[in-house]
């Protein structure tokens, strides 16, 4: 047998060269191996088995005057005689007789060899060797530019520098402080996300240069998983690498030998492919199983005409067709390579995409062989080119700014700015800084990070050190994120608030925060072409429960509908823009809270009545005048909170009585004049706000509200309070200020749980001493004119002043 490994040297190359082998070269290499196996297999059969087997022909040449007996003998020699009829008395005996040629083994071998050389077509004889030779030529052509001294030296030098650039600690560490790493592109860049953080910093690696290394050799490292700082030795190595890249660029950009070499070897392969297809297609039919052999060796063998069998004809025929298929695929691949070589401008390489990704504009474009090698590397993995771009960029100023920022904002100084936000989380607000200090990620107790008006923010991998971080606020910030940081936020971030003015300030990575529970968006989502900011699908936010949009949309965005199945609370603050299309609300079957604020609604949307799980509805600051549709709320059995405040409602329909499950009701800031007694049939109400209306009279039926704890009638025209109000023994807050009241009933002493009382702005001349019976009422909870407070007995005043 012929071992295939013996031919490995024809295609063997350094493993590092694989980065310059695009997919088509790898594919043709595999095709070459397959064709090589066909050739080796055919050659092995040629060596191991008989090539041809011949037998002499007994038929004499035909003559014009042949006798009938000669013809009969010829027929007899080719036609077997019928067996004799057996005698019925004797047993049947058959004697097997062959045709005797009186030839010995040596003569047969001689005949076989002569017929093989003289009669067998050359294509059938040399087919496996042709396959082997053609394949070796293909393999040599594919790898010639790796072997030729003029090109291999440049390739080896480039691969050496490329590997050092890719693995340089500076590439990973220093760049994370200067630029923001782009969140990984869709698509797809999962191989990059599986790499170490060294690889992940690829796009933003474009931000450093040798001057950065020279001036700041010991910069704090963002990725603490590898090391704490960039030491002096690593800085010197990176500095030397910058110099190598500069010199290599000057040297390689001068010529285009690599491009010319690759084009020529590809053209040669295409020409060879056409030749192989042409002659193989024409000669494949010459591979025949039966071969007639006429050689003048009668004086040595006694025969001149022979009938031969080419033993491997059938197999060679199949192998030839298989070989033609492989060569065809190989040739088509080479044609595609030529198309790629001539269609693409491979002598120029633009880093425009990297510049856009990183926001660094000083990465220069390259040309000639340098550009060609970068194009080839992009076919292997574009990440190499992006990381290599680091050492073509000048960003020492940005590096210095980052260092100064870290020195200015020490961890102790940042801790002094910590405060508790509205969500009761420990928050660090940073406003109008030149960047994001790395020292922020040393404050491990941080729960909420608020960034305002900070451009080109980079969230590095070290955000993973903030184990308690659950909330992130980005107000007018253009933010990029390290992939490792994105992975951390996907697992830990619960609340995200984004205030944006344009698309750049709306982070694209937020759509992948699978554990995000609350999302607050503030910004214009208009369909103006000049400022077209749209939401992408939120379907990946599987845990999203609360969504708040403060914008100017005319309909509910489709992105919101994508999370309708698990959304529990939705708030739309529309800044006065009319919200007209609300049919998508019907899809939010699990919605429990809905706020439609300042949406210019004139009627209560009918789609709301389909939300059977709804518990709270807020229609603040709309243009509601009539609420007759309120009767449909009776189907919403779980509705407990209804806020129709800041509208233009003039009356409350009697259908309100059917909303027996209501516990909180707000009609403040409307134009209501008459308070219907039916309202108080909603006897579960605990919170009732009727402030800032034109109400003059409170029906005595208010005493039915035995669960009432909060009642506000502030800024109305009420002249007296019914005594039944004081039957609401659970009342804790009573606001009756800015009315026309002149007397406060002594029965107010029955409200033992009263802790807040506002009576300021009325016509009282004296306060009843029974206020002393309200033990929970203190001076801080009593809103009244100082002079009126002095009308209380001294012991009552002292009691209220006592904490």
Curated annotation (Swiss-Prot):
It is found in: Cell membrane; Endoplasmic reticulum membrane. It catalyses: chloride(in) = chloride(out); iodide(out) = iodide(in); taurine(out) = taurine(in); 2',3'-cGAMP(out) = 2',3'-cGAMP(in). The volume-regulated anion channel (VRAC) channel forms a trimer of dimers, with symmetry mismatch between the pore-forming domain and the cytosolic LRR repeats, a topology similar to gap junction proteins. The cytoplasmic N-terminus preceding the first transmembrane (residues 1-22) regulates volume-regulated anion channel (VRAC) conductance, ion permeability and inactivation gating. Expressed at highest levels in skeletal muscle, and at moderate levels in heart, lung and peripheral blood leukocytes. One of its GO terms (molecular function) is volume-sensitive anion channel activity. Coiled coil: none annotated. Residues 48-124, 285-314 are extracellular. Glycans are attached at residues 64, 70. Keywords: Cell membrane, Disease variant, Disulfide bond, Dwarfism, Endoplasmic reticulum, Glycoprotein, Intellectual disability, Ion channel, Ion transport, Leucine-rich repeat, Membrane, Phosphoprotein, Repeat, Transmembrane, Transmembrane helix, Transport. This is Volume-regulated anion channel subunit LRRC8C. It comes from Homo sapiens. The gene is LRRC8C.
């Amino acid at each position: 047998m012929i071992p295939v490994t013996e031919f490995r040297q024809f295609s063997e190359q350094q493993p590092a060269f694989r980065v310059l082998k695009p997919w088509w070269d790898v594919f043709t290499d595999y095709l070459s191996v397959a064709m090589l196996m066909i050739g080796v297999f055919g050659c092995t059969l040629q060596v191991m088995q008989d090539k041809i087997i011949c037998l002499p022909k007994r038929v004499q040449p035909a003559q014009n005057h042949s006798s009938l007996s000669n013809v009969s003998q010829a027929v007899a020699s080719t036609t077997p005689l019928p067996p004799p009829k057996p005698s019925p008395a004797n047993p049947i005996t058959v004697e097997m007789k062959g045709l005797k040629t009186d030839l010995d083994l040596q003569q047969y071998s001689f005949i076989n060899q002569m017929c093989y050389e003289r009669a067998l077509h050359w294509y059938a004889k040399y087919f496996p060797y042709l396959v082997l030779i053609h394949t070796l030529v293909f393999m040599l052509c594919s790898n010639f530019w790796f072997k030729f001294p003029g090109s291999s030296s440049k390739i080896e030098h480039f691969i050496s520098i490329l590997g050092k650039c890719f693995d340089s600690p500076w590439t990973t560490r220093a760049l994370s402080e200067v630029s923001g790493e782009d969140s990984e592109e869709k698509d797809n860049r999962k191989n990059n996300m599986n790499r170490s953080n060294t690889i992940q910093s690829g796009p933003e690696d474009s931000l450093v240069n040798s001057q950065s290394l020279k001036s700041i050799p010991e910069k704090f490292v963002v990725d603490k998983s590898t090391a704490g700082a960039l030491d002096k030795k690593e800085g010197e190595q990176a500095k030397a690498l910058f110099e190598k890249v500069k010199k290599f660029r000057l040297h390689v950009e001068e010529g285009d030998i690599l491009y010319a070499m690759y084009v020529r070897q590809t053209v040669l392969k295409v020409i060879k492919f056409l030749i192989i297809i042409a002659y193989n297609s024409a000669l494949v039919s010459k591979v025949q199983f039966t071969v007639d052999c006429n050689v003048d060796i009668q004086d040595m063998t006694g025969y001149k005409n022979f009938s031969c069998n080419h033993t491997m004809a059938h197999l060679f025929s199949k192998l030839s067709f298989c070989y033609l298929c492989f060569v065809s695929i190989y040739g088509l691949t080479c044609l595609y390579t030529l198309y790629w070589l001539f269609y693409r401008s491979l002598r120029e390489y633009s880093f425009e995409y990297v510049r856009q990704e990183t926001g660094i504009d000083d990465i220069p474009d390259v040309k000639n062989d340098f550009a060609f090698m970068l194009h080839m590397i992009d076919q292997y993995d574009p990440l190499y080119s992006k990381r290599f771009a680091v050492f073509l960029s000048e960003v020492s100023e940005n590096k210095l700014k980052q260092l100064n920022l870290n020195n200015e904002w020490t961890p102790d100084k940042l801790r002094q700015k910590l405060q508790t936000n509205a969500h009761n989380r420990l928050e660090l607000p940073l406003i109008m800084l030149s960047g994001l200090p790395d020292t922020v990620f040393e404050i491990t107790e941080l729960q909420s990070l608020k960034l305002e008006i900070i451009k080109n923010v980079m969230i590095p991998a070290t955000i993973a050190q903030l184990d308690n971080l659950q909330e992130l606020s980005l107000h007018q910030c253009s933010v990029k994120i390290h992939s490792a940081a994105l992975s951390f936020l996907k697992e830990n971030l619960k609340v995200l608030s984004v205030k944006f003015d344009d698309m750049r300030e709306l982070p694209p990575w937020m759509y992948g925060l699978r554990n995000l529970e609350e999302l607050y968006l503030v910004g214009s989502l208009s369909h103006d072409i000049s400022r077209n900011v749209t939401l992408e699908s939120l379907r990946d936010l599987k845990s999203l429960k609360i969504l708040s949009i403060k914008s100017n949309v005319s309909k509910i965005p489709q992105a919101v509908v994508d999370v309708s199945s698990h959304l529990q609370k939705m708030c739309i603050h529309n800044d006065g823009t009319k919200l007209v299309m609300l049919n998508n609300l019907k899809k939010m079957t699990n919605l429990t809270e809905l706020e439609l604020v300042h949406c210019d609604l004139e009627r209560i949307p009918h789609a709301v009545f389909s939300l059977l799980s709804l518990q709270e509805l807020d229609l603040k600051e709309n243009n509601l005048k009539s609420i007759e549709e309120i009767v449909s709320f009776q189907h919403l059995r779980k509705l407990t909170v209804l806020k129709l405040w800041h509208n233009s409602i003039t009356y409350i329909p009697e259908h309100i009585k059917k909303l027996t499950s209501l516990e909180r009701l707000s009609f403040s800031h409307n134009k209501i004049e008459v308070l219907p007694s039916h309202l108080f049939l909603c006897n579960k109400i605990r919170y009732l706000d009727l402030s800032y209306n034109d109400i003059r009279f409170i029906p005595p039926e208010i005493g039915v509200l035995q669960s009432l704890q909060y009642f506000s009638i502030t800024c109305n025209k009420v002249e007296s309070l019914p005594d039944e109000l004081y039957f609401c023994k659970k009342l804790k807050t009573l606001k009756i200020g800015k009315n026309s009241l002149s007397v406060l009933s002594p029965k107010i002493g029955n409200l033992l749980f009263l802790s807040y009382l506002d009576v300021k702005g009325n016509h009282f001349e004296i306060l009843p001493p029974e206020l002393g019976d309200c033990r929970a009422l203190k001076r801080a909870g009593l809103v009244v004119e100082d002079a009126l407070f002095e009308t209380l007995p001294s012991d009552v005043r002292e009691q209220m002043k006592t904490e």
